[in-house]
């Protein structure tokens, strides 16, 4: 028996020896290959580390667009199934902390037992995952959490817009892939975009498995020239106009488009740019924003049907997606740069400047208004024709009264060649190259030497027959009143890195001088007559206590069939302030206002400008130079009451616009409903740390709160000269803050209705 055991032991020993020899031989011949294979099997797949898209801020640092870290909830079913003891505790954790349907998880796990990437919930905020994170880190719950396996989070970024609809036309938004579309998001997409990082493993020269990480490079931040407070003021009054005029003479919005630009006349910086209707940047695909607009069919043609709640609701159905997209594309466009129209009588100061600069006019000439003038077989009326001929008018009086006949005579003195030369000098027919996506081309929409004859020259003198964009008009107008200096309009003042260091300062770019300082001075005088003259068409644009200049405009529109509309107009006011030392220009346009009396609507364009300037000028520390009339003082007192009511209703003192400038943040939790609005901006398979890695959204450095001299830190209305709190018994103060009444001086002549050719 003992011998048998010895023999068996020897045989086993020989077998082990033989196996060892075999292993040595295999290792000698194929060891490197097998070792690399084993090491390669040990390394993890390459992981992408997402970059953070740069922020868009206003000129004072208010966040207009930012990116927040979000988390996708992922379940590794294979890991959960490693032990039977893991399954139910893991599913229970999903139910308790994330409200996941446990039965749904069980069913999926049964069908896909080897799945390692089951996405249960997308784009959760850190707050939504923090309770689970704390539970897993809590050692006192070890008896429970040690059985929770396979739950992990994939990081990405979501684009958020803290002020929702504020400056939506200017900002634009991002698609689901993180690329910008429309506005600054599109134009500066390459600047705002960063470079994804990577975490990966490799085998080094010593056959060791190494891990390395290439950090993500975040995008640059873009500082806009937009002032959020001024932007909010502009948007408030555009909305107020719509609210007061929608459904007035026909169903629909107060105007097809209502828009405004405020620009620094000495730099081309855009301080505010807005149009109505607007949309929520956090919910760009919401069809409710279309209510009140005319329906655009699936072929892209405008119809007479007005979108109501029922039509908007039907657009949410999948079969109507093409219809929704057509109408949203129209909504997302920026009227101030994307749309063209005939400028009407706001063109008249440009024409006067042509003749003065060319030397064919001295400034002391008079021209006769005969009420009607015949050009090329067409009879063209003066807008005031119903009251008879205006008689002999100076150039200034022609601008003040907005007389078409005398402007035609001035254009005839200038001549076709010089007229076309200055049209190009003012940049009509050329893009301004503003740094926003989608500026319209107008080269084919203006006359040239082959297409302009006597009739075209005549109609061009009062702004009909050719098309412009709002940005062309206000940029050219700034050169008329700032001494002749034409600055390229721009929306961004600087670009910074994620650490705050300045990458690039964008300085004003002077392109040319359109007219001399002497001509510019005369044009300013003429524009002041429009507002202050006895027969001025722009008297309702005058803010209390200030002198300003400007020009009203009314132009007939052209229907889809090419005929002149007799009831639909474009009315506008183009002005500057203050008259003594121009600092800002303002341009208000109402496209096809919801009214029949176009003179009245020109007044309303003036009133919008007046209300905006009443708030903006004191905000910019531009003080009154005129004593208030009793009527003006009454208006300002009514405004003070309105502000007190807003304050008593707990309205944020800094929210002068009625928009979300006050720092109200959007709800960033959960899966957003914005469709293409927010972007995943790439993702990273990473388990977040216990601390909140980023808190980027929601804080808005309110320019109004920091700079408004009329509200103290407690939100109380104060006298800016004494600092005393104004009560119901106070006498008030002279400088307006917000929202004066719209009743201007009685007896205003209103706007100038553009005349059709008979």
Language model segments and positions:
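Periplasmic/cell-envelope proteins involved in peptidoglycan metabolism and beta-lactam response
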Residues: 1-311, 340, 417-425, 543, ...
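Beta-lactam-recognizing serine transpeptidase/beta-lactamase-like catalytic domain environment
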Residues: 65, 71, 203-215, 258, ...
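Short coil/loop linkers at secondary-structure junctions
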Residues: 99-101, 361-362, 429, 623, ...
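Short, highly charged C-terminal tails/helix-capping segments
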Residues: 624-648
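Short helix-loop capping/hinge segments that flank enzyme active sites or metal/cofactor-binding pockets
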Residues: 686, 703-704
């Amino acid at each position: 028996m003992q011998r048998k055991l010895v023999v068996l032991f020897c045989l086993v020993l020989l077998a082990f020896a033989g196996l060892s020899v075999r292993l040595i031989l295999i290792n000698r011949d194929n060891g490197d290959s097998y070792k690399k294979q084993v090491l390669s099997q040990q390394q993890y797949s390459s992981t992408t580390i997402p970059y953070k898209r740069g922020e868009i801020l206003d000129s004072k640092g208010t966040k207009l667009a930012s990116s927040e870290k979000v988390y996708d909830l992922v379940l590794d079913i294979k890991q959960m199934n490693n032990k039977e003891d893991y399954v139910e505790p893991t599913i229970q954790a999903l139910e308790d902390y994330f409200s996941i349907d446990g039965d749904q998880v069980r069913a999926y796990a049964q069908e896909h037992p080897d799945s390692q990437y089951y996405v249960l919930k997308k784009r959760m905020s850190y707050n939504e995952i923090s309770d689970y994170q704390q539970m897993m880190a809590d050692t006192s719950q070890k008896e429970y959490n040690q059985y929770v396996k396979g739950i992990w989070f994939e990081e990405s970024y979501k684009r958020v817009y803290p002020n929702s609809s504020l400056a939506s036309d200017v900002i634009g938004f991002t698609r689901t892939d993180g690329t910008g579309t429309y506005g600054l998001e599109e134009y500066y997409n390459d600047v705002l975009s960063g470079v994804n990082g990577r975490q990966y493993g490799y085998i080094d020269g010593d056959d060791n498995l190494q891990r390395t990480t290439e950090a993500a490079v975040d995008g640059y931040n873009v500082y806009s020239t937009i002032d959020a407070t001024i932007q909010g003021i502009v948007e408030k009054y555009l909305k107020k106009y719509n609210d007061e005029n929608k459904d007035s003479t026909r169903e629909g919005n107060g105007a097809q488009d209502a828009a405004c630009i405020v620009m620094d006349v000495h730099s081309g910086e855009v301080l505010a740019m807005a149009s109505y209707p607007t949309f929520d940047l956090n919910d760009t695909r919401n069809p409710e924003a279309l209510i009140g607009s005319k329906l655009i069919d699936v072929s892209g043609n405008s119809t007479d049907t007005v979108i109501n709640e029922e039509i908007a609701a039907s657009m949410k159905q999948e079969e109507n997606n093409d219809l929704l997209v057509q109408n949203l594309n129209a909504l997302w466009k920026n009227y101030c740069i994307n749309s063209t129209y005939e400028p009407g009588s706001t063109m008249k100061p440009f024409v006067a400047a042509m003749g003065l600069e060319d030397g064919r006019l001295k400034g002391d000439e008079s021209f006769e208004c005969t009420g009607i003038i015949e050009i090329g077989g067409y009879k063209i009326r003066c807008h005031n024709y119903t009251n008879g001929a205006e008689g002999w008018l100076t150039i200034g009086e022609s601008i003040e009264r907005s007389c078409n006949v005398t402007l035609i005579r001035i254009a005839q003195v200038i001549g076709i060649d010089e007229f076309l030369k200055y049209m190009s000098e003012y940049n009509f027919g050329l893009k301004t190259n503003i740094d926003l996506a989608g500026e319209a081309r107008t080269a084919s929409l203006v006359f040239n030497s082959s297409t302009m004859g006597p009739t075209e020259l005549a109609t061009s003198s009062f702004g009909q027959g050719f098309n412009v964009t709002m940005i062309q008009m206000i940029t050219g107008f700034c050169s008329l009143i700032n001494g002749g200096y034409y600055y390229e309009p721009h929306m961004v003042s600087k670009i910074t890195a994620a650490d705050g260091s300045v990458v690039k300062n964008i300085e004003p770019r002077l392109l040319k001088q359109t007219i001399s300082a002497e001509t510019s001075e005369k044009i300013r005088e003429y524009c002041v007559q429009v507002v202050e003259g006895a027969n001025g068409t722009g008297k309702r644009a005058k803010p209390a206590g200030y002198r300003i200049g400007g020009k009203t405009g009314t132009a007939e529109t052209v229907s889809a069939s090419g005929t002149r509309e007799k009831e639909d107009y474009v009315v506008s006011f183009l002005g500057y302030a203050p008259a003594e030392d121009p600092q800002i220009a303002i341009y208000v346009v109402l496209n096809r206002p919801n009214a029949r009396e176009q003179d009245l609507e020109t007044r309303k364009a003036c009133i919008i400008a007046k209300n905006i300037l009443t708030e903006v000028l004191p905000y910019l520390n531009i003080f009154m130079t005129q004593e208030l009339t009793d009527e003006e003082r009454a208006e300002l007192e009514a405004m003070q009451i309105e502000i007190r009511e807003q304050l008593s209703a707990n309205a944020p003192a800094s929210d002068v616009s009625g928009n979300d400038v006050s720092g109200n943040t959007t709800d960033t939790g959960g899966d957003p409903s914005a469709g293409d609005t927010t972007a995943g901006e790439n993702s990273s398979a990473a388990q977040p740390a216990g601390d909140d890695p980023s808190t980027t959204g929601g804080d808005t450095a309110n320019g109004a709160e920091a700079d408004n001299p009329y509200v103290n830190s407690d939100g109380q209305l104060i006298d800016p000269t004494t600092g005393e709190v104004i009560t119901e018994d106070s006498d008030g103060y002279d400088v307006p803050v917000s929202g004066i009444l719209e009743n201007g001086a009685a007896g205003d002549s209103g706007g100038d209705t553009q005349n059709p050719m008979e």
